Amino acid sequence: MLLQAFIFLLAGFAAKISALMTNETSDRPLVHFTPNKGWMNDPNGLWYDAKEGKWHLYFQYNPNDTVWGLPLFWGHATSNDLTHWQDEPVAIAPKRNDSGAYSGSMVIDHNNTSEFFNDTVDPRQRCVAIWTYNTPESEEQYISYSLDGGYTFTEYQKNPVLAANSTQFRDPKVFWYEPSQKWIMTAAKSQDYKIEIYSSDDLKSWKLESAFANEGFLGYQYECPGLIEVPTEQDPSKSHWVMFISINPGAPAGGSFNQYFVGSFNGTHFEAYDNQSRVVDFGKDYYALQTFFNTDPTYGSALGIAWASNWEYSAFVPTNPWRSSMSLVRKFSLNTEYQANPETELINLKAEPILNISNAGPWLHFASNSTLTKANSFSVDLSNSTGTLEFELVYAVNTTQSVSKSVFSDLSLWFKGLEDPEEYLRMGFEASASSFFLDRGNSKVKFVKENPYFTNRMSVNNQPFKSENDLSYYKVYGLLDQNILELYFNDGDVVSTNTYFMTTGNALGSVNMTTGVDNLFYIDKFQVREVK
């Protein structure tokens, strides 16, 4: 216990000292959480403190290096608005230097089913963390409880609460299932391709109920499962159950990604409606999605956040003294009328970014209500940009316009560096492919130029959200935050998250719109503004 306390104190001290260094790196994201220093990966233990009005985010954390390594801790951050985060001292530490406090979740034990609490702890703050203790010999599920609202934790003396004689059994995600008055856990038998479902009365004794196995993309292993009831967009009083599973390695685009299944849950078994794997985010940098145990109802009931990186290259990204960021928090719903193609409707996960900003520049409108030609490109300079921008674009394709398939029929946006315009992001839509593309390779940063896994070009299929008067309309919202880009198509029916890296200090702030064809694209609205 003395060694554990010493490690805990060292990590907390390092986190506090590094707070002084936060502003030394000019390209740190403004509205995506990053640790003050050290390595970060999976989000863990997400919950909302209804007493204090505060959100809690824990995460896999190595304070001693900028690459993954043991011992691995639970880092901690808090927020009042889900956008601006305050780094907190380490919350959970492993017992040994060759071990890790691996991923897990948090619950609020309002009714004290665990008997860890007395009346001095507000029921809204009765936090119990369920996490994987990893050693070279095994992975076992532990619980720890907090008596101070989630800042420090005491380990349950009779841990582990669940073991399987395996080194590949991890990532417990726990929620309360009201109809049966039981706790439900999903945990990954990673290399058996199983998500096992357990139930418990007290968080201490667990019963295996069923397994969801060998479904969707298998890759190398399953990780970071989650099961949550998600309301429908058309009628929020109705809902379906969604099973999230992370895959690494083995993503179709390389490395790591998240898939999901839509179905029903009866308290013991999850049954997918069609067993078809669906993709949560089509970018390269969105992994280990976890949803919040509870929320402020004004934000909705299904909120989640993911690690904004990819295991293929995460150890090499050019940031210092930290490495990795989180995505924005997203509000999830299910679009039960998603038009996958002209003949098929599907149930589709919809994502809406949570972004609370009070200090932003004015929206700059240009090219709106105009038809693009090769001769009339549009541009705007945000000369004081710090590199965090958001934009909204609504455009239409003229379906009566005949264009040769051999012509690259693009609408392109160019976000160029203010100090060096030879560094830029190019993104846009190509009509023949009906896809939105991104080129993040136009950088002088060595990592971008030389790392073969950092895919420079990628695309996402897009379908119009409406068609009228021979025009097919598309919509995209984008947030560029220093070195991470989130794109939401047609109000979040499709999402793509990707990191990018420019020379330090070369903030993106010059925006150009061009096309390679005449009279094909109609711009209904385009606006951009700086986020400060």
From Swiss-Prot:
Its EC number is 3.2.1.26. It is an enzyme of class 3 (hydrolase). One of its GO terms (cellular component) is extracellular region. The keyword Glycoprotein applies. One of its GO terms (biological process) is sucrose catabolic process to fructose-6-phosphate and glucose-6-phosphate. It catalyses: Hydrolysis of terminal non-reducing beta-D-fructofuranoside residues in beta-D-fructofuranosides. Pfam families: Glyco_hydro_32C, Glyco_hydro_32N. Glycans are attached at residues 23, 64, 97, 111-112, 118, 165, 266, 275, 356, 369, 384, 398, 512. GO terms for molecular function: beta-fructofuranosidase activity; sucrose alpha-glucosidase activity. The active site is at 42. SUPFAM superfamilies: Arabinanase/levansucrase/invertase, Concanavalin A-like lectins/glucanases. InterPro entries: ConA-like_dom_sf (IPR013320), Glyco_hydro_32 (IPR001362), Glyco_hydro_32_AS (IPR018053), Glyco_hydro_32_C (IPR013189), Glyco_hydro_32_N (IPR013148), Glyco_hydro_beta-prop_sf (IPR023296). The keyword Glycoprotein applies. Keywords: Glycoprotein, Glycosidase, Hydrolase, Signal. Substrate binds at residues 39-42, 60, 102-103, 170-171, 223, 311. Residues 1-19 form the signal peptide. Belongs to the glycosyl hydrolase 32 family. This is Invertase 4. It comes from Saccharomyces cerevisiae. The gene is SUC4.
